[in-house]
Every structure is written in C-alpha cells, then in structure tokens.
Amino acid sequence: MTQVTNRQTLLEKVGRKWKSDPIFSTGLVLALMVILQTVALGFDYESFGAWFTNWGKNWINILRNNAGVGIVALGMTFVIISGGIDLAVGSTMVAIGAVIMVFINQYPDGLLTAIGITGVPAYAIGIVAGVIFGCLLGGISGVLIARSKLPAFIATLGMMKILRSVTQQVMQTAAVKVPSSFLAISNTKIGGEVILPILYWLVAAVILHIVSRYTPFGRHVYAVGSNERTARLSGVNVERVKGLIYVLMGALVAVTAVIQVSRIGSMDYANAGSGYEMDAIAAAIIGGGGRHQHERRTRLHSGHGAGHADHRRDEQPAQPDGRAALPARGVQGIHRDRRGAFAKEGSYRLTARQRKERKEKSMLNIGIIG
C-alpha cells in the first residue's frame, strides 16, 4: 500500500513539474526520444561494439538532417505565439534558393569584386540577396495579415501557391550548380563530422531565446498573442509587431535555404521544401509554441480566430469557407499548366476575403442585409 502511495506521489510531482517547468518537460521528452531512438538504432548492427561506435554518428546525422526544419520551427514559434500561422515557408525556401543560385551563377567572379570590393567570397552577394528577399517575402505576408486584415491561414496559403508556381515558371527545369566554395558553408568537417548545420541551429536557438525572453519585441509578441486589444491599449503597435514576426520568419527561412543549397549543391524546384511548413508547425507546437497559455492551444484547435475578442466579425468561431475553395480549385481544371494554375489559385485565395467583404458592404448599402 505504501509503495502504491509513494508511486502516486511521485507521478503527481512529475505531473506538476511537467506543467510548471517547460525546461523539465522538454528535457524529459528529449530523454525519451534519445532512449527510443538509441534502441531503434541498435537493431541496425550485428554487435554491441558496432552499435556503440556508430551511435554518435547516427545522432549527428539525425540532427543534421533536421537542422533546417529546426531553424524554421524557431520562427514558427513566434508566429504561433502571436496567434498566426505560416504555410508558405516551404515555397519561400524554394524561391529564396532560386535567387541565391541565380546570383551565384550570374556573378561567378563576384559582383563585389566588380565594384572594387575584394577579399569577399563570390557567393556572398547571393547570400545577402537571399536574406533580403526572404525578409521581403515575409514582410509581404505580414502586411497582408496586419494591414489588410487577411486571416494568416489564407494569406500564407495564397503566398505558398504563388511562390511555388512563379519559381517553377521562372526556373523551369534549369540545372543550376554552385561552386565548391559555397558547399563549404554546410559541408566543412569539424572533428571529422559535418556538424555546421547543427551549430547554426544552436546559435539561432540561443539568439531567439534571448530575443523572446529579454527584449521588448519578445514581450510584445506574447502580449499580442495573449490579447490584441489589451496589447494595443498598453501602447503596443500590434501591426508593427505582426509584420516584424513574419519578416523574422522570412529571414530564418532564408538561412535555411542557404544551408540546404550549400549542403546539396542544387535544388529541386518542384518538390524542395514540400512539407516543411507542417513539420515546422508540429515542432513549434510540441516544443512550446502553444504551451505558454492554454488559450493559445485552444485557438489552434478550436477554429477561433486569433483576434476573435477584438473584432465583431470574429466574435463567433471561424467557419471554413468552402465556397471560396471551389472556384479556386476549379482554376486548375481549366489550365493545362499546373504551375500557372497554382499562381492563379493563390491570387484567388488572397482576394477572396476582400471580395466577400465588398459584396456584403454593397448589400448593406442597398438595404438587402439588415
């Protein structure tokens, strides 16, 4: 009886610790993952010695292969905490990768050298252009969401379709290669192993942890996600914060694009980045994007708009508008080239909300409604 009571007490303590201490819960999950993955990896080798020798290498491979998603998930955490979502990260990564590779191939001797700046790698201009382009794309999403009041789901879904389509149209099947010096960004060995992508991931995690905990911007992100109206009354520029969140997201996607292109040396414009958004969203939620407040999890699962307390039109649960999806899907049926159809579908999704609101407004003006 005493053993059962002690066991229950221990479980209760662990449960309370799990709910109150995010570091403890994260560490427990990671420990469980290590144990399960270690056992699974053990089945691939004939002897314990072979398993032990390759244990570290296997974990390095796992972390290296997930570094890109991990970096994107860091930005997605900010997005989800603020009450938003970003479905365009995969397509954005492909578009940025295309820009990087085009710049590298257009200026193989270095644009900086041409204007008198020496000692800088030829691919530096490509990286800078990629990061700027990523921030620009993130800024566009931020403006659509913060200024145009488009739901984040619709805005980023439209951006996803447009970016994927335009990138495929522009690049076609062009096989663009990058110089070996650029490959060194991710493939340089340290201690006999390729761990640079993991280090980039860790550095980004540390920087963004500091930003979220110890800067006004980090506090404003939590304030906006908790209650937009209260944040606005407290002097927070909600639109600016939302815009900067998506700019940050674009910059992190650009970093991921640099890592991916420099690892592989090429990019599949049709399939690269597919599923990145879902993996990043899942990682952000599991890792803590939705755990700081119960309300954040509720919003993510219940279908309520992130600003449902702030605007009359969002006071009731948001309903998926299937009517807007039907003609958008039909666009693909009347175009043989699916790449062009995706761009048209994305444009339709971005404008559907405004068209619906204009229609309701005109009906109110002529007295059909109310």
Per-region residue spans from a language model:
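Cytosolic-side transmembrane-helix boundaries in multi-pass membrane proteins
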Residues: 1-35, 39, 206, 233, ...
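Membrane-interfacial amphipathic/re-entrant helices at transmembrane-helix boundaries
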Residues: 2-71, 108-125, 354
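Transmembrane helix-bundle core of multi-pass membrane transporters
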Residues: 16, 124, 148, 152-214, ...
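Single transmembrane alpha-helix segments in multi-pass membrane proteins
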Residues: 37-41, 55-107, 143-150, 284-298, ...
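Inter-helical junctions in multi-pass inner-membrane proteins, predominant
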Residues: 43-61, 167-170, 189-194, 212, ...
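Alpha-helical transmembrane segments within multi-pass membrane transporters and channels
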Residues: 109-159, 306-307, 311
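Helix-loop-helix "hairpin" substructures at the membrane interface of multi-pass membrane proteins
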Residues: 123-128, 136-141, 193-268
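Transmembrane alpha-helical segments in multi-pass inner-membrane proteins
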Residues: 247, 253, 264, 268-333
